[in-house]
Amino acid sequence: MSDLPSSFDNGNSIDENEKSPGYYKILERCKEQPLVPLGCLATCGALILSARALRVGNKRQANRMFFARVAFQGLTVAALIGGAMYYGQDPKQKLEQKEREKMLARHREKLWIEELERRDLEVQERRKRAAAFRQQEEEK
């Protein structure tokens, strides 16, 4: 039932992260730690350039690019560890945050169901009034 939108909610659901495709999570992580994707791109670039140098037969350039690839991989791992230390939270805090988000989602769902029930009662009351009005018109 939580898949349906609520009239009082602006559409930002807590469970969107769980239901969103993987690339949204990747984009979110890239925004959190922008040095890691840059390091990955640099590593891939060095690998591609080393393969190209090997194809041409330039051993010196290929060797430099292999060295650059290892250096970029090391910098990427360092950025990953540094970002984890800088942005990292205590696992207990993350668990508590998830629990709060789940409770908020349950509360929103409960409010949404109450709103649907209230609207259903309003519709039923309107139908009763319309039926009573029709019956009065038929009697006249």
Curated annotation (Swiss-Prot):
GO terms for biological process: mitochondrial cytochrome c oxidase assembly; mitochondrial respirasome assembly; regulation of proton transport. The keyword Cell division does not apply. It is a multi-pass membrane protein. Disulfide bonds: none annotated. Pfam families: HIG_1_N. It is found in: Mitochondrion membrane. Its main location: mitochondrion. Residues 7-98 form the HIG1 domain. The chain crosses the membrane at residues 35-54, 66-88. InterPro entries: Hypoxia_induced_domain, RCF1. Associates with the respiratory chain complex III/complex IV supercomplex. This is Respiratory supercomplex factor 1, mitochondrial. It comes from Yarrowia lipolytica (strain CLIB 122 / E 150) (Yeast). The lineage of its organism: Eukaryota, Fungi, Dikarya, Ascomycota, Saccharomycotina. The gene is RCF1.
